[in-house]
């Protein structure tokens, strides 16, 4: 059982907080979805763009992690046709009528299936979004509920995408951890698991997100501000803007829009990378906003360390003592499930 699966079993969510609003039949913004708190100013910013095919740009990865905690990658090896197919299948999924989608609704103690994002439990107001979580064999089980006789194409596309993300995440984590001084021997756990046991490989899951057209986007929130609990997140955001990050220079006072770049993917550093780098890599606060004219979809792939692997700061020395204690991912996920964006502070030395 993966750390993420165990987390959901140990921290079940009230079923009333799982099923999203039927957005198709909602013409005005209900009070349950009105976020009245004034939001900080949003601007555009020079988010780093790094080509993975250019060795001269690999040195920019660490700088991007330290200064931004988020960056675009191009020439990543994931074909445009696969990204297009993923986009089409997400829209196919989320365009289903509500009575069909709830056939695959996740149970209160389950980590996969259809429903609202888990972080909604930390807010009084609801978010203008819906999601579909995928992990392992759950994909075909839930897809069969949605399309009893026509699920093969959806499953094949998502399985191909998960495999591409597995390969890309291994490559990225190796490069990023290498920039902190780790050797190939240190990163033995990054070798892709060929046995199917999952004991010598990263843990991962895929979150498909839908942000429907909103009647009053200035008062709504697609995805509330948060950091990710992973090592890193690889995000496909299509060609419609919506992702915003907290300004590294003006935290809490300004948001920066991450404009889509055709064919690129966005990498967001997670809390575990912040811990491993002893605070050098930023775990960036980010959110998703909605709009009045376009239905936006995104696919977020979360990568974490193997189950029961202890991690801790790797770059500490006598001049820079460790600021976080060692932990396993399951332990951190449990803290995040209770303390949300304050979880990092619990692991300080």
UniProtKB/Swiss-Prot annotation:
Enzymatic class: oxidoreductase
Tissue/organ expression: Expressed in flower clusters and siliques.
Pathway in which the depicted protein is active: Plant hormone biosynthesis; gibberellin biosynthesis
GO-annotated molecular function: gibberellin 3-beta-dioxygenase activity; metal ion binding
A Pfam family the protein falls into: DIOX_N
GO BP terms: gibberellin biosynthetic process
Chemical reaction(s) catalysed: gibberellin A20 + 2-oxoglutarate + O2 = gibberellin A1 + succinate + CO2
Function in brief: Converts the inactive gibberellin (GA) precursors GA9 and GA20 in the bioactives gibberellins GA4 and GA1. Involved in the production of bioactive GA for reproductive development.
Name of the molecule in the record: Gibberellin 3-beta-dioxygenase 3
Annotated source species: Arabidopsis thaliana (Mouse-ear cress)
Gene: GA3OX3
């Amino acid at each position: 059982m993966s750390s993420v699966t165990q987390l959901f079993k140990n921290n079940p969510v009230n079923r009333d907080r799982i099923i999203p609003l039927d957005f198709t039949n909602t013409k005005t913004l209900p009070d349950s979805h009105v976020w009245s708190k004034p939001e900080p100013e949003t601007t555009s910013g020079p988010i780093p763009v790094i080509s993975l095919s250019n060795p001269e740009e690999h040195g920019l990865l660490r700088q991007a992690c330290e200064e931004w905690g988020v960056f675009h990658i191009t020439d990543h090896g994931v074909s445009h046709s696969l990204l297009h197919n993923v986009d089409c299948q997400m829209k196919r999924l989320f365009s289903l009528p509500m009575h069909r989608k709830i056939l695959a609704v996740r149970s209160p103690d389950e980590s996969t299936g259809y429903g609202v994002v888990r972080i909604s439990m930390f807010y009084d107001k609801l978010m203008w979004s819906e999601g579909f979580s995928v992990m392992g064999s759950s994909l075909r089980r839930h897809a069969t509920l949605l399309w009893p006789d026509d699920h093969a194409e959806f499953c094949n596309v998502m399985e191909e995408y998960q495999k591409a993300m597995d390969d890309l995440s291994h490559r990225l984590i190796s490069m990023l951890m290498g920039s902190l001084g780790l050797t190939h021997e240190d990163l033995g756990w990054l070798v892709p698991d060929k046995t199917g046991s999952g004991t010598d490989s990263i843990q991962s899951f895929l979150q498909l997100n839908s942000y429907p057209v909103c009647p009053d986007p200035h008062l709504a929130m697609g995805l509330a501000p948060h950091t990710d609990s992973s090592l890193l997140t690889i995000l496909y955001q299509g060609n419609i803007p919506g992702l915003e990050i907290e300004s590294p220079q003006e935290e809490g006072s300004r948001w920066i829009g991450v404009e889509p770049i055709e064919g690129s993917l966005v990498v967001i550093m997670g809390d575990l990378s912040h811990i491993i780098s002893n605070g050098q890599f930023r775990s960036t606060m980010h959110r998703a906003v909605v709009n009045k004219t376009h239905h936006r979809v995104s696919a977020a792939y979360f990568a974490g360390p193997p189950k029961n692997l202890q991690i801790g700061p790797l770059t500490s020395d006598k001049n820079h003592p460790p600021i976080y204690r060692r932990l396993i991912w399951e332990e951190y996920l449990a803290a995040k499930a209770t303390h949300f964006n304050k979880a990092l502070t619990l692991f300080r030395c």
